[in-house]
């Protein structure tokens, strides 16, 4: 059983120290597509966290019984099954959000973060640490998504979770929404600023000069 210190490290390290988007530059496509609203970013975070944690758990449980030649296929089958479960739950209980997320829920199957943790960690580790690692990397992914979604929705529409936060000019307020924040390039800019901020705060993440 992992100690409390190891569990804390596994959960918190992917948020800043080894963030899958900011440091490893993985899972960027969905970060651009689902962050126009904080609500969709939050749901996508939960979906990826669920899939990453349980795919790690199941891969770890059967890792000694998977032939090396088909390990990627087995991992993909497990991940795909979990994604189908998530997709069906969203369709049943959060249909409007499911429509907004569109194909990007299905594309979790090909998300490099999920595949990477299954191959690099779960195949070599015990079930509980693998499950915790999945939660941690899901949180790291979600940290970027939720931060980007927060600024895009707030500055792009003056709302958060669909509720008006900044009084809009059209309603007699003072804020004029910035339409650029609702376009995909704004997510690139925000992720770039986040990477800069994290690497300023964590200079050890800077790449060595050639």
UniProtKB/Swiss-Prot annotation:
Reactions this protein catalyses: a ubiquinone + n Na(+)(in) + NADH + H(+) = a ubiquinol + n Na(+)(out) + NAD(+)
InterPro entries recorded: NqrD, NqrDE/RnfAE
A GO molecular function held by the record: oxidoreductase activity, acting on NAD(P)H, quinone or similar compound as acceptor
GO cellular component, one term: plasma membrane
UniProtKB keywords: Cell inner membrane, Cell membrane, Ion transport, Membrane, NAD, Sodium, Sodium transport, Translocase, Transmembrane, Transmembrane helix, Transport, Ubiquinone
A Pfam family hit: Rnf-Nqr
Compartments it resides in: Cell inner membrane
Membrane-topology annotation of the record: Multi-pass membrane protein
Primary residence: membrane
Transmembrane regions: 11-31, 42-62, 70-90, 103-123, 131-151, 178-198
One of the protein's GO biological processes: sodium ion transport
EC number: 7.2.1.1
HAMAP family: NqrD
Stored PANTHER family: ELECTRON TRANSPORT COMPLEX PROTEIN RNFE, NA(+)-TRANSLOCATING NADH-QUINONE REDUCTASE SUBUNIT D
Assembly with partners or alone: Composed of six subunits; NqrA, NqrB, NqrC, NqrD, NqrE and NqrF.
Role: NQR complex catalyzes the reduction of ubiquinone-1 to ubiquinol by two successive reactions, coupled with the transport of Na(+) ions from the cytoplasm to the periplasm. NqrA to NqrE are probably involved in the second step, the conversion of ubisemiquinone to ubiquinol.
NCBIfam families named among the record's database cross-references: nqrD, PRK09292.1, PRK12405.1
Family listed: Belongs to the NqrDE/RnfAE family.
Protein name: Na(+)-translocating NADH-quinone reductase subunit D
Species: Vibrio anguillarum
Gene designation: nqrD
């Amino acid at each position: 059983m992992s100690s409390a210190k190891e569990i804390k490290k596994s959960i918190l390290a992917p948020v800043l120290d080894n963030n899958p988007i900011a440091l490893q530059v993985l899972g960027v496509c969905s970060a651009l597509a689902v962050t126009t609203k904080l609500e969709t970013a939050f749901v996508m975070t939960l979906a990826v966290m669920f899939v990453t944690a349980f795919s790690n758990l199941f891969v770890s449980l059967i890792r000694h019984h998977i032939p090396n030649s088909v390990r990627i296929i087995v991992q993909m089958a497990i991940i795909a099954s979990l994604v189908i479960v998530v997709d069906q739950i969203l369709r049943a209980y959060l249909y409007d959000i499911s429509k907004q997320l569109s194909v990007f829920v299905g594309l979790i199957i090909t998300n490099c973060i999920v595949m990477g943790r299954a191959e690099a960690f779960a195949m070599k580790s015990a079930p509980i640490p693998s499950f915790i690692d999945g939660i941690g990397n899901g949180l790291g992914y979600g940290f970027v998504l939720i931060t980007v979604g927060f600024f895009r929705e707030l500055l792009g529409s003056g709302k958060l979770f669909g509720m008006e936060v900044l009084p809009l000019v059209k309603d007699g307020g003072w804020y004029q929404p910035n339409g650029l924040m609702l376009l995909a390039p704004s997510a690139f800019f925000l992720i770039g600023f986040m990477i800069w901020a994290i690497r300023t705060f964590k200079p050890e993440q800077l790449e060595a000069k050639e």
